[in-house]
């Protein structure tokens, strides 16, 4: 079974078993040399909006903002994504929906992310679409994910993306 080497334990093999080590094979990850692949397209998604920008000084202390337990648990689950790219490599379409949705979900579920939620959701999804294939719901990504990120985050991201497109289009018309 194909898996990330960080999730592979030698105790799972018997003496004489053959082990094949090769780089992730995905259109979004061109091989640079030997076992190294260029994973910079994942960085482009984060650069497109995978952060919260807040002017310091006037902002309230983040620890004083109440977060409902369910939202905190879901955000924590999404934040568990380590950005390894196993989801992209496992997908027959080389899609990065699970990675992107984990980043969108992590920020979008917290009160601190609400101010910029629609702009970075749109930017991150569009950056993802520039570098990776489209999701056709095979679910291989979630199966390969070492952090067991749920496919539910893809639905969350798709919903937020549609809301963002509608909202941002409405705002663009209000000049």
What kind of feature is each model-predicted range?
Residues 21-27, 31-175:
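Ferredoxin-type iron-sulfur electron-transfer modules in oxidoreductases and energy-metabolism complexes
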């Amino acid at each position: 079974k194909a898996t990330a080497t960080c999730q592979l334990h030698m105790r799972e093999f018997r003496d004489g078993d053959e082990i094949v080590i090769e780089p992730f094979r995905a259109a979004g990850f061109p091989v640079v040399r030997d076992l190294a692949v260029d994973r910079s397209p994942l960085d482009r998604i984060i650069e497109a909006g995978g952060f919260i920008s807040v002017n310091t000084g006037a902002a309230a202390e983040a620890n004083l903002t109440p977060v409902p337990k369910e939202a905190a648990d879901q955000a924590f689950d999404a934040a568990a994504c380590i950005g390894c790219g196993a989801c992209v490599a496992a997908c027959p379409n080389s899609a990065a929906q699970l990675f992107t949705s984990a980043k969108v979900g992590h920020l979008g579920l917290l009160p601190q992310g609400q101010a910029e939620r629609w702009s970075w959701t749109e930017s991150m999804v569009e950056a993802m679409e520039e570098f990776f294939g489209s999701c056709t719901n095979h679910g291989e990504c979630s199966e390969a994910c070492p952090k067991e990120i749920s496919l539910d985050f893809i639905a969350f991201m798709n919903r937020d993306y549609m809301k963002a497109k509608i909202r941002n289009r409405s705002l663009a018309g209000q000049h």
